[in-house]
Amino acid sequence: FREKYPDIEFHYREYPDLPVEQLFAGNEGNVAFSIGEFDEHLYQVVPLETFPIGLLVNEKHPLAQKESVTIEDLQGEPMFIESSQFHIYHLITERCEEAGFEPDIIFQTSGFSLCHKMVKANKGISVAVDFVFDDMREDGLKLIPFSDGNYEWKACMLTRRDEEENEGVQCFRKHVQEWLQKIRSGEIIR
């Protein structure tokens, strides 16, 4: 983006999902990226892509024999998961509560890499987004789809409805959408 639009001032900061939303609601920044559903009365929401979430297990774990899993399969299993600052944590814990149990979360982290390491060591299970699993793929790990509902990571770009988009924001939106189209067409790899 900076190469294509050198005259547009661009600053980028990365935070977990919930702090991004809190900062953006407090008028920090012009554009935000986050995961989940958003109030479309407050924000112009551009859905970017939706990714399936699966259960991450060591291939030696008994659940690795399954072709698909349900949320009930997590009951009693030690789990490593991204912290409560991320939507994936709330999706999984809410589904567990709806199924009538509390997940056995033994560690909350700020990233998927520790979850993958602990599952590789067969210390427990985790959940992961398909593209993260593909990026971090290692022998001995298996990502199993959920069969009891929609488990998705919906990435969105947000701007505020009550603000007129300046030229920089418009150019950035176009750049992001063109970049995603190139990924979808196979022209570039994520």
Predicted segments, located by residue:
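Secondary-structure junction motif
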Residues: 78-99, 165-173, 180-189
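Beta-alpha-beta core module
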Residues: 41-52, 113-162
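Beta->alpha turn/N-cap motifs
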Residues: 16-17, 33-38, 58-59, 111, ...
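Central regulatory/effector-binding core of bacterial HTH transcription factors
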Residues: 1-40, 109
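Flexible hinge/capping segments at coil-to-helix
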Residues: 43-53, 57-79
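Alpha-to-beta junction loops
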Residues: 24-33, 53, 101, 119-126
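A local structural motif
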Residues: 4-12, 97-106, 141
